[in-house]
A protein has these predicted regions:
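Conserved GNAT-fold acetyl-CoA-binding loop/helix
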Residues: 33-55, 66
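Acyl-donor (CoA/ACP) binding surface of acyl/acetyltransferases
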Residues: 1-35, 67, 71-187
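Juxtamembrane/interface motifs at transmembrane-helix termini
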Residues: 44-48, 56-58, 72, 100-101
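Short loop/turn motifs at secondary-structure junctions and domain boundaries
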Residues: 59-63
């Protein structure tokens, strides 16, 4: 998979991340309220952000679909990332996301995630999408609920964070059958 499709929602454009997104990403990735909740350390320099974007771009070489930049249409600002990772073609993937704190509470991630989930089930032919979040990340848990994912259980001591702290994580899942039944009922 060389290029991700460009996906549009009412307020957002989801497109391939690029090195040119580094200044916008660095702006939010330094925030201690964002990275640690997603399992990564706050960025310490723009060079670190550039390196991480490089890793995102390299993930395609390992067979991952890639990372989408979440771009706000109103100002063309990159305000977050969203991706399907731990991808097994035709079977499953995990959904991950991060968003600038300035845009929390506006329904941005659910809006972006709906487009990615549709792409995963319809275009990639996935049978299952999972989301894992720390048990105390209430905002992310709320996103899972809004999206219609089912809480499947807690993996006790299931996540080793960048700083060596071990956390319990909650696993949410959605199958293709659930997704297509849900979307059929919305029509």
């Amino acid at each position: 998979m060389n290029h991700l499709p460009m996906l549009e929602t009412k307020r957002l454009v989801l497109r391939d991340i690029s090195i040119l997104d580094a200044p916008d990403m660095y702006e939010y990735a330094t925030d201690y309220d964002i990275g640690p909740l997603a399992g990564w350390a706050p960025h310490r320099s723009i060079q670190e952000t550039i390196g991480i974007i490089g890793m995102f771009l390299d993930s395609k070489k390992r067979g991952e679909p890639g990372v989408f930049a979440v771009v706000l249409k109103e100002n063309n600002k990159m305000i977050g990332t969203i991706e399907l990772y731990n991808y097994v073609p035709g079977f499953k993937a995990e959904l991950g996301y991060a968003l600038s704190k300035a845009y929390w509470g506006r329904g941005i991630i659910p809006e972006a995630a709906e487009a990615i989930i549709n792409w995963g089930f319809v275009t990639l032919g996935l049978k299952r999408i999972e989301i894992a979040t720390f048990v105390d990340n209430y905002r992310s848990k709320r996103v899972c609920e809004k999206l219609g994912f089912t809480e499947e259980g807690v993996a006790r001591k299931g996540y080793l964070r960048y700083d060596g702290i071990i956390f319990d994580k909650v696993i949410y899942g959605m199958t293709d059958t659930e997704y297509f039944n849900k979307t059929k009922n919305l029509k």
